[in-house]
A protein has these predicted regions:
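Short loop/turn segments that connect beta-strands within beta-propeller blades
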Residues: 26-27, 64-66, 105-107, 158, ...
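Short beta-strand elements that form the blades of beta-propeller/WD-repeat-like
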Residues: 5-16, 48-54, 87-94, 134-140, ...
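Short glycine/acidic-enriched loop and turn motifs that connect beta-strands
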Residues: 57, 95-98, 142-146, 236-238
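N-terminal "mature head" segments of proteins
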Residues: 1-48, 53-56
Length: 244
């Protein structure tokens, strides 16, 4: 595939481009291949599941470890997506002045649709599902009184969440910071990264913000693997261990 990107996956690696995505094991054996036509593919991987969507397009492919795939037609432009370890997919979809956060079952059926607006909740910039797909975290960016603030909200799609408006069970605000990344690391541990701070959350039902660290330097990039997060600054790298 021309213009390909490689990602570590299972006992090998994924290769994806505008034309398709494939899984090759470390021995060089082609395990599966999914063709498509996308202008700007974005990929989410969790355990053996892979979700690939067309940024600003309307299609998502939800692919299991054996290569079985389900095509999801979102009907709206995809801005971001996340897959859980059981194949549940969450996607941020733009619809004019409204932005939707839809959750789809592995069958491709829409299970949840959350309506957001810039005035009420802010603009969702990042979404992530817990491994079991029961919790979802969303990082919002909102303008208020001439400055920007970020909001990290958690949704519970299980019984507990039914007692809350829009299933939102907890939410945390951070002034004068932009949080472009919010990620789950398992079923009950999650983290978010802003331009000048790092937050850690824990909870099986109602996640709590248990740790907040302000950074002296602005974060240039973030990489995560397993229980570790690496922060890339201007010329230096710092590692943080996540409690499982």
């Amino acid at each position: 595939m021309s213009g390909s990107t490689l990602l570590s996956y299972q006992n090998g690696f994924l290769t994806y481009s505008k034309d398709g995505i494939s899984y090759t094991d470390y021995k060089g054996n082609a395990m599966w291949n999914q063709t498509y036509d996308m202008q700007s593919p974005c990929v989410s991987v969790r355990s053996g599941w892979v979700a690939v969507g067309d940024y600003n397009g309307n299609l998502i492919y939800d692919i299991s470890q054996d290569g079985t795939s389900k095509q999801i037609d979102t009907n709206l432009p995809v801005k971001s997506l996340s897959v859980a370890a059981n194949g549940v997919v969450a996607a941020i979809l733009e619809d004019g002045d409204v932005t939707w956060i839809n959750v789809y079952n592995p069958t491709g059926e829409k299970a949840v649709g959350i309506k957001t607006t810039m005035q009420k909740s802010g603009y969702p910039v990042s979404v992530s599902l817990s491994d079991n797909g029961k919790l979802m975290m969303v990082a919002y960016l909102k303008a208020e009184s001439g400055s920007m603030k970020s909001i990290v909200s958690f949704y519970n799609f299980d019984e507990v969440g039914q007692n809350y408006t829009d299933t939102m069970v907890s939410s945390y605000e951070y002034s004068d910071t932009v949080i472009p990344l919010a990620e789950f690391a398992g079923t009950h541990t999650a983290y978010s990264v802003g331009n000048n701070q790092f937050m850690l959350y824990e909870g099986n039902e109602i996640p709590k913000n248990i740790f907040q660290n302000f950074m002296q330097e602005e974060v240039q990039d973030v990489r995560s693997s397993g229980n570790y997060v690496a922060f890339i600054f201007n010329g230096t790298v710092s590692y943080t261990h996540l409690r499982a």
